[in-house]
């Protein structure tokens, strides 16, 4: 198939190129290489892709192939003439229309990458990687913006329409049927068009301060989409569009290749002029040869919001920067933050199971082309676009992956088919054409939505995942663990097998994600006044900059050092506190029990053009959540969001950490008994201890109040009612329902026995000398259960 594609592309490239062919072709060190001599071939010189690029380049006067992707004038003798225009053959065909500094830019990618990777640019432009529609909806909901209530998704980063209908462009027949039904059932999460996030005037914001949420959105939250180059900060350097992922950038942003025209001292450049992709796309850099897309590439964006990228690496931001480094300073900031190492996801860890090689998984090893590029539809949230579930590879204790029905573990309250999903012998055409292909053995496994996993195969009694790193991993199958009785511990057997409801109702990571980054209280000040120099506050507006595009595919912030366009106002942020342990549990959009994390617990303060406060420590309200829940209390719009945190551990949460933990159940840390005085100002001075009156006449408020916050930030249930929003995207997401909490909660179990310790006669009969170990205690309880059961005969 690759040979067929190359042949077709060469025919296309050579058609209509008579003018270019009859001119004298540059040779030696002429053309692009007269300046860029030494630059790395974008792919290995003997790869089909590089052969193709150079063949097209030769037909357009550039044997090095630069013009194939970049355009430009290969006859130019200086930067002004060389970096202008494009060979007529390419302009008249489907190639570059002008010089493209970054051919990956999504705004011109249909004329560069899209020459071969047809329709990818269309798909990516409508994917969450570019629209960020879900992030926008969720964040603005926390400000109390009415237009995004009731799960509506009206806005994206830019105006965009789904012009080819809602049947996916790509995917298997099963996938297309599955998604068509899903779109029909959940139309709000698959909008047919988006308009750009509005930018209210400062006057409008002063009259309605919650509209400052739009400033916050445009200046802070929207820098991580592929339509722009992003922030010039350590760890955030990247390209645009396709280059965001497929061109390597080091965290320091230095070029370490051999092109003499690219500065080695200026930050913000690619690491090397290479494409990183799948296993076959190997990159040799210094002493390291690697393949695949490193996790840190993904983290140039996935370090805020749900923080799943840095969490996967085991990192959680913290404010201290300890320990000190060799120069006596604090650790350097990464993504503008400093980090504490907790524990990386088991799939990321270098040490693996005994039967597997050393090495962790890359994001792309699990996530599919649809997850990352989209399928041509517009998605309103992550659960709409991502098609994979843990059970797709691991199965359950009762069923191997291929025995599960499609839709397993993302039920969305629908009945699942009774038929097995099976295996498939067929790859997606896109995978077969461009990715590394692997022997299907007995067949490729399928995703929950029916697409083939091109890198995961059934091989006899085993499932093998082929990682883009070059490693092949045997995947543990839960049913095989049960058949072999090879459980690592009794806890695992009980949690995954004995308690059937766990399989039916829980996400795997409800237990295995034993830590989650929890940033409680997002205190945001948006200031439209003047700074200390008397200048009006303003900051980079990522959407304003991304909306200005030139013929070269560049946006306003693309040239290094420009920092894009600015809009009025400046955002200042802080928080209440951070935690990682024992995350709260709730229900996600699929209807399963999942960890929750503070999604955006916005408490906003807004200052007008005269530096006067027009809104102080305000909370939005979720009238839509109140209506869905049918409760009297109106939940605050601050969000505890359902999340797949990407922090899975081999040792899962203990039974007690959920069943004997008020926080996990939603009642707050230690049952919500702490931090209960937010609704009142706290003054710390000389106090009349009889009355609580402040004695000095001149005193200040130590801790200003948050008037509507009558609970601890981690509390989502108070007096039987939900206190804050739990997810904004799907009708099913909410706190654990009362019946489930009642079935789970086992706090106070110790009293069942130990309240009788003062009954000397009884306790003498059941106690033993010394102290029981934990294991002995469990055995004692087991004996009691069996004795009780025997008494029922």
Please provide the spans of the model-predicted regions.
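Primarily extracytoplasmic ectodomains and periplasmic/lumenal surface modules that are beta-strand-rich
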Residues: 40-41, 74-75, 118-123, 517-518, ...
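Active-site-surrounding "flap" and adjacent substrate/cofactor-binding loops of secreted or lumenal enzymes
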Residues: 51-74, 80-94
């Amino acid at each position: 198939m690759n040979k067929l594609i190359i042949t077709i592309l060469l025919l296309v490239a050579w058609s209509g190129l008579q003018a270019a062919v009859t001119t004298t072709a540059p040779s030696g060190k002429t053309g692009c290489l007269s300046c860029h001599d030494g630059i790395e071939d974008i792919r290995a010189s003997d790869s089909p892709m590089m052969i193709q690029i150079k063949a097209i380049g030769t037909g357009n006067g550039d044997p090095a192939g630069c013009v194939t992707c970049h355009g430009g004038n290969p006859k130019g003798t200086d930067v002004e003439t060389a970096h202008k225009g494009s060979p007529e053959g390419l302009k008249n065909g489907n190639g570059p229309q002008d010089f493209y500094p970054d051919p990956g830019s999504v705004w011109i990618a249909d004329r560069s990458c899209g020459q071969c990777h047809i329709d990818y640019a269309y798909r990516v432009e409508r994917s969450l990687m570019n629209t960020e529609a879900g992030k926008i909806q969720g964040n603005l909901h926390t400000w109390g913006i009415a237009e995004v209530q009731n799960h509506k998704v009206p806005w994206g980063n830019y105006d965009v329409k789904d012009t080819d209908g809602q049947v996916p462009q790509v995917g298997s027949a099963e996938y297309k049927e599955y998604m068509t039904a899903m779109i029909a059932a959940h139309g709000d999460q698959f909008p047919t068009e988006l308009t750009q996030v509005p930018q209210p005037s400062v006057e409008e914001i002063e009259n309605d301060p919650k509209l400052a949420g739009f400033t916050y959105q445009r200046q802070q939250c929207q820098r991580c989409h592929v339509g722009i180059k992003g922030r010039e900060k350590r760890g955030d350097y990247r390209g645009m569009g396709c280059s965001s992922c497929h061109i390597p950038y080091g965290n320091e942003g230095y070029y370490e290749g051999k092109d003499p025209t690219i500065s080695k001292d200026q930050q913000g450049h690619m690491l090397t002029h290479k494409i990183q992709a799948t296993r076959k796309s190997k990159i040799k850099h210094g002493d390291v040869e690697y393949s695949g897309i490193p996790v840190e590439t993904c983290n140039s964006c996935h370090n805020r919001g749900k923080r799943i990228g840095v969490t996967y690496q085991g990192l959680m931001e913290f404010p201290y920067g300890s320990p000190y480094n060799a120069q006596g300073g604090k650790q350097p900031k990464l993504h503008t933050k400093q980090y504490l190492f907790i524990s990386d996801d088991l799939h990321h860890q270098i040490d693996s199971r005994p039967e597997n090689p050393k090495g962790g998984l890359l994001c792309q090893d699990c996530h599919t082309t649809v997850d990352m590029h989209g399928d041509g539809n517009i998605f309103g949230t992550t659960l709409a676009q991502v098609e994979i579930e843990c059970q797709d590879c691991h199965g359950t204790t009762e069923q191997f992956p291929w025995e599960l029905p499609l839709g397993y573990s993302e039920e969305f309250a629908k009945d699942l088919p009774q038929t097995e999903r099976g295996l498939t012998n067929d790859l997606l055409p896109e995978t077969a054409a461009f990715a590394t292909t692997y022997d299907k053995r007995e067949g490729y496994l399928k995703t929950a939505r029916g697409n083939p996993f091109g890198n995961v195969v059934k091989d006899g009694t085993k499932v093998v995942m082929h990682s883009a790193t070059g490693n092949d991993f045997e995947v543990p199958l839960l049913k095989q663990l049960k058949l072999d009785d090879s459980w690592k511990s009794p806890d695992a057997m009980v949690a995954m097998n004995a308690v059937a409801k766990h399989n039916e109702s829980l996400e795997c990571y409800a237990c295995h994600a034993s830590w989650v980054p929890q940033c409680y209280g997002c205190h945001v000040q948006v200031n439209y006044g003047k700074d200390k120099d008397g200048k009006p506050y303003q900051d980079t507006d990522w959407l304003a900059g991304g909306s200005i595009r030139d013929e070269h595919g560049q946006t306003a912030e693309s040239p290094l050092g420009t920092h894009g366009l600015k809009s009025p106002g400046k955002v200042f942020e802080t928080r209440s506190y951070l935690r990682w342990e024992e995350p709260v549990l709730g229900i996600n959009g699929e209807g399963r029990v999942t960890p929750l994390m503070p999604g955006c617990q916005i408490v906003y303060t807004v200052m007008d053009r005269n530096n006067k406060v027009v809104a102080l420590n305000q909370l939005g309200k979720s009238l839509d959540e109140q209506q869905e829940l049918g409760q009297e209390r109106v939940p605050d719009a601050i969000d505890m969001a359902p999340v797949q945190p990407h922090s899975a551990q081999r040792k899962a949460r203990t039974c007690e950490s959920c069943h004997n933990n008020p926080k996990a159940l939603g009642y707050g840390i230690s049952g919500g008994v702490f931090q209960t005085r937010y609704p009142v100002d706290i003054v710390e001075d000389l106090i009349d201890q009889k009355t609580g009156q402040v004695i000095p006449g001149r005193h200040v408020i130590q801790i200003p109040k948050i008037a509507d916050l009558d609970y601890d930030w981690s509390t989502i249930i108070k007096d039987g009612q939900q206190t804050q929003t739990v997810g904004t995207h799907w009708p099913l997401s909410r706190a654990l329902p009362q019946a489930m909490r009642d079935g789970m909660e086992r706090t106070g179990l110790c009293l069942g026995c130990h309240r009788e310790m003062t009954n000397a006669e009884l306790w003498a009969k059941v106690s033993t000398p010394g102290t029981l170990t934990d294991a002995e205690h469990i055995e004692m309880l087991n004996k009691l259960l069996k004795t009780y059961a025997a008494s029922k005969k």
